[in-house]
Amino acid sequence: MKIRNLTLALAGTALVFSACEKDPDPKVPADNANIALATILPNPDGMTGAAYLQLIRDEFPQNTNNNNGIPIPYEGAYPVIEGNDIFVFPGYMGDSKNELVKYTRVNGRLSKTGTMKLPPNSSATNIVFASAEKAYLSMAGLGRIAIFNPITMVQKGEIDLSSLGVSDNNPDPSAMLLRDGLLYVGLSQMVGGWVPPQDRPYSDIAIIDTQTDKLLKMITDKTSGISMPTRPIDRYSIFMDEKKDIYISCVGAFGMVKGHNAGILRIKAGETEFDPTYRWTITGADISGEEKTAGFISAIRYVNNGKAYAYINMPGYYKPGEQGHTAIADLAVEINLYDRSMKKIKGLDLSNGFGVMLALYKGTVLIGNSSTKAKGIYSLNIQTGEVSK
């Protein structure tokens, strides 16, 4: 198996396809397993539960269970894959051991091959690899970025961004992207909870020179009304197209603060400022084939030629009393970044927030979905737009 074939998919609420908890059936064969499956099993409150990580074969359809699953922190950010290694984060709220854990694929199974101790309440969420021996780890809870060797799992340094915090000493560094020797870091600027100050519907990006590991500058969009650049747990919420233009998905305080909009901003190739000609507001935007308007992008994955696939959280589908990840209110869409349009993907029901994972694999998009009818992973043909049954 080629290293590039190790792919992450995630299913929420219950196991992919048929299983729904630790299953008494025999272990699922792991030969030729090259898809990493993270499974989330929330309790009714959505704030607690269990999570597992395992490898599965790329045979569809198939049934699986959690007997091969490795317990991982329930509230951790999505695991990050680099080659044959998978990096697992501690719980975002500090409800687990304070460490970054590395697992390596060996003969179709995952083996624990390293750990790196982290400070308490780090809320580590994202890794960017500068080289085989140098990586950056954002710690949203501390306002810092750790520099470490992903081979030895030893920290080598740290970048303190606390001076960029608004109303506190923490700008909440989130998802990151490396382009031309510069590290672009989304700053969520959350204050006293999950949202930024109401009077500041802005988007901030820190830019770091990776040759010196020093802050170059912070850039701010103050005019679009779009806020909270990148979703902390989604490494793909900041990405590049083939032109090397950077696109940033901003979650707009998750729709919880009046005057804050979700949207997409751009930093063009060769530039280190926001592109004033590209400010696409997602909040309230129309979606072709769908009667209700958009809220914010809960997950996104760029494919090519301006095309991306995403889940849009839809406030119009929230039922009384529903909130956050437990609401069945996320709609799968195809996005055209260049003409700023969205269309509904046929063949998928609304999902809760636990199942909204997108992965690229062998010319298809693997889409996690946790609806009222079924919970599993579906394959979408990029060329035809058809979804597996």
Where do the PLM segments sit?
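Bacterial Sec-dependent N-terminal signal peptides
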Residues: K2-T39
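Short glycine/acidic-enriched loop and turn motifs that connect beta-strands
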Residues: P42-G46, Y92-S96, G141-R144, M190-W194, ...
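Beta-propeller blade signature
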Residues: Y52-L55, K102, N149, Q198-D213, ...
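Post-signal peptide N-terminal segment of secreted/secretory-pathway proteins
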Residues: Y52-N149
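Surface-exposed loop and turn segments in beta-propeller and other repeat-based domains
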Residues: N67-N68, G114-P120, I159-N169, L215-I233, ...
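Repeated scaffold domains used in trafficking and secretory/extracellular systems
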Residues: P71-G83, P120-V128, D168-M176, S227-S237, ...
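Short, conserved, GDST-rich strand-edge loop motifs in beta-rich repeat architectures
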Residues: V185-Y202, I248-G263, A310-I328
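Loop/turn-rich, solvent-exposed surfaces of beta-rich toroidal or solenoidal domains
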Residues: A294-S370
